């Protein structure tokens, strides 16, 4: 269905899915193109009881180029709990991502604020689409924290939903802004890195 809508409207979609591959199940995210081609990312960092049901992702963090009337943009994907590992967003940024799409079922209350840091430390746009409401399973209950959020490369919140809002947020962004990695005239977040000092 998403592929049909993408073709009709000439748009791209990023969506979370449960993916079956042989006997393995993955918590995955797909980037659906208007031409029907689908890119897949499999969640690297499984959260809590996900480890009982899903296999750890094996795709790695890849960046995909999309194009249309807006020009071109480079998209990376990470899923939910991937956010807590700064290497996730940094890997995507180092590979050229301008926009990091982050479909989520967040239950921890502080991720949406942490996405400010992921955006600023990598000078990218981050788009977190989170679930709202409660889910009951047997005797347990999960509360999803909502507050879907879009942050720009300088840490400005371009949009933020409420905790219980089920909504569509439309925001215009210029992906080229994410190409500027200068913090000051003498500091560039990538050129100033010291990988030789980061080893275990």
Region spans (language model):
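Short helix-loop capping/hinge motifs at secondary-structure junctions, enriched
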Residues: 36-39, 156-158, 178-180
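Active-site catalytic loop in hydrolytic enzyme cores
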Residues: 4, 20-95, 104, 110-117, ...
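Hydrophobic residues at beta-strand termini and immediately following loops
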Residues: 41, 64, 129, 161, ...
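Glycine-rich, aromatic-flanked loop segments that form ligand/cofactor-binding clefts
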Residues: 18-20, 133
